Amino acid sequence: RAILRLQQQKYKDAEADFDHAIHLSTRNAGVYINRALARYHQKNLRGAMSDYDIALEIDPNNFIGHYNRGLLRAQVGDDNRAIEDFDFVINMEPDNMMAIFNRGLLRDQTGDYKGAIKDYSTVINEYPNFVIGYQYRAQARKKVGDIKGADADEFKVLKAQLDKQNGVSQNNQTADNSESGNRTRKK
């Protein structure tokens, strides 16, 4: 019932149900994680953080708890500890592109531009049409003095925007024919 109330956005009722579940079983990390979500949606960030901490004391390998706590830590400005949570998630799930992208944003914010570029590049390699990844990578590349790389990323963004305006689907684009670019005209 608590999960249903959470899905119905009845957060106060969901929290009460999770309180009852915790009273019955204090060692269930999932209940604390779900109550943290209910508390978060009621703007009780301290309560949500406390629940994530308790959940991770119970189950230190719970990557959902680490991911959600990382998001919350980022929201409250605890960037370095948020990065630690995302590092944990990425170690558990190396293909978790959302965790990698979020870590990239945080690395960018904390001045680790090379780390941010690496994370953005990982996501872009997996999702080549992820335009916002190119935007953020271009900004980070400018910060490390890679103007050529930044220009290439900005060109990708501009091309994607023009293609969207002209109704060109990114999935139907054909690769540039590099052979035709090397041809010379006969005079």
Describe the residue ranges of each PLM region.
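Alpha-helical tetratricopeptide repeat
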Residues: 2-187
